[in-house]
Amino acid sequence: MTAHWPRRCARVAQCLDDPRLDVAPPNTYLAAMAILPIIEAPDPRLKLISKPVEAVDDGVRALIADMFETMYDAPGIGLAAIQVGVPKRILVIDLQEKDEEGGETIRDPRVFINPEIMEESEELSVYNEGCLSVPEQYADIARPAVITAKWLDGEGKEHVERLDGTIATCLQHEMDHLQGILFIDHLSRLKRDMIVKRLNKLRRAA
């Protein structure tokens, strides 16, 4: 997802505090990193189904570090490995919340490897979503307001958490990428075509 913060348009479920997920310290992913090119629609690679990670090794952690660097540079708040051309089930998310007192951005990098949604609510939340692979385009997307998800972190530790709010929306958005789905695929054909036309117009003007 992009750094354009999702705008909450409608919320049915009661808001819960975003959990502080147990991941490796930020410095684990903020050293010796490289910025990777982000694939943009309509690149056919974005339609690939990503494969599970068999072992969380140094190669996976190096990719995670590069993904964080790429996401922060874009800037964005979420990135899937397939968006940098790697069809593996790896996601990175950092909501980069603001410090209420100093107003500074607080980084909170989170890693999701082989994520699965185990339960989801019938209640929906609608957020104005964007995507680094569909630059400068946004649309209101309805998703389950509360989910229970399972995943591995960057150290291979399993987590099972009940999530809601922005983190739940962002995780579902990024997990769509693992199935070859973009946020615009949730729209009607008319709305999707309008976004594609705007995207092509911006590219021609660049």
Specify the residue positions occupied by each region the protein language model found.
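Active-site rim/adjacent substrate-binding subdomains
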Residues: P19-Q172, H177-A206
